[in-house]
């Protein structure tokens, strides 16, 4: 399948699949989407709600300086890299698990400009390291951030109450509807700890209903640039 590197509206690059007319990140801004969906409405909401405008206070047992995150669709590593930067900034420890069935090749990774666009040029080698470390083993990347990359299908996730946050960043339901089913979301529900959250860029009604049908409490939230809404699901 043909794969092109394209520039998005905020200046950051992503990978475009012409055959599917699908991108790894939003064409309206790869970095803006990642920050809004996964950091602001995910990590900040759970750990530092005061950073989220209009956020309600959370009880003490919902706050933690030791967070376990599962990413569904490790892809370019953008979400992992931004989360690493936030872990250092907020002084929180994160164990990050990135699941990817079809890893992106290093020749594509080397073309991406995320460290530059994030004003994190000094961490460019860290971004590369996220991709160079071996799969299926934990790696301490910084004092606050460890990563385990897992080369497997999303349907193979069978962990129980293991994660505080799930970044659900699979390709869209238009091109891969099998990734947005009740079966998948039941696995996600089981994998989350109590009061854990799942955040995703999608706001499709069928996705929201699939989440609700397996037990999630689902919120519609304002979306990133180019999207009216997104979803956050809580295991309560």
Role assignments for model-derived ranges:
Residues 1-46, 66-67, 85-97, 101-118:
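Rossmann-like AdoMet
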Residues 110-159:
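S-adenosyl-L-methionine
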């Amino acid at each position: 399948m043909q794969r092109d590197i394209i520039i998005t509206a905020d200046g950051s690059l992503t990978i475009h699949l012409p055959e599917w007319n699908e991108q790894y990140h939003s064409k309206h801004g790869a970095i803006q989407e990642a920050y809004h969906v996964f950091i602001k409405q995910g990590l900040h909401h759970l750990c530092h709600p005061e950073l989220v405008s209009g956020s309600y206070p959370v009880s003490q047992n919902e706050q933690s300086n030791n967070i376990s995150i599962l990413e569904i669709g490790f892809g370019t590593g953008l979400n992992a890299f931004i989360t690493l930067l936030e872990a250092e900034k907020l002084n929180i420890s994160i164990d990050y698990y990135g699941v990817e069935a079809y890893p992106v090749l290093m020749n594509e990774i080397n073309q991406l400009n995320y460290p530059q666009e994030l004003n994190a040029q000094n961490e460019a080698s860290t971004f590369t390291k996220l991709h160079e470390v071996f799969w299926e083993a934990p790696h301490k990347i910084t004092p606050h951030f460890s990563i385990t990359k897992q080369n497997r299908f999303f349907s193979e996730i069978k962990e129980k109450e293991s994660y505080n946050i799930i970044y659900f960043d699979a390709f869209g339901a238009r091109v891969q509807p099998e990734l947005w089913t009740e079966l998948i979301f039941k696995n996600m529900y089981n994998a989350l700890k109590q009061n854990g959250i799942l955040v995703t860029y999608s706001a499709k009604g069928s996705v929201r209903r699939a989440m609700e049908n397996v037990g999630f409490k689902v919120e519609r939230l304002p979306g990133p640039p180019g999207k009216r809404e997104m979803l956050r699901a809580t295991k309560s």
